[in-house]
Amino acid sequence: MKTEFSLAQLADPDIAEADKILRACVHCGFCTATCPTYVLLGDELDSPRGRIYLIKEMLEKDQTPTAEVVKHVDRCLSCLACMTTCPSGVNYMHLVDQARVRIEQRYERPLAEWLLRRVLAFVLPDPQRFRASMVLARLARPLAVFLPTPRPS
């Protein structure tokens, strides 16, 4: 993939690494067949190839991540299925990791999303907190009928 980073941008080791990864991608699309989010949603931007385009544009323009970029990068499950099928050996996961770091540094998430992410980061790594949250969830389950059903957009 052709990139258009400036020399000043390439002085940053992270951008230089991203440039190397981006140049390895030949747009063959083999990754799309193994990507669970693409298979489920059918949106090109939810495939590794689509995310690579979004990340490339974000990095080249050195812009704050948009809600669309964040949505599609967040949908990546980090399952690495795309990397196992890529004939060019694109280190997709490293590129997505860089994008996620940039998103966390520059993107201001809505309060509800920010709070949910903080709670999950607090609860999931600790088995005792996770067990306690499951007990609370079981007790709160009857209240679920009053909540709207989320749908992917």
Question: What is each stretch, according to the model?
Answer:
Residues P13-L22, D46, I52-S153:
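Iron-sulfur-cluster electron-transfer modules
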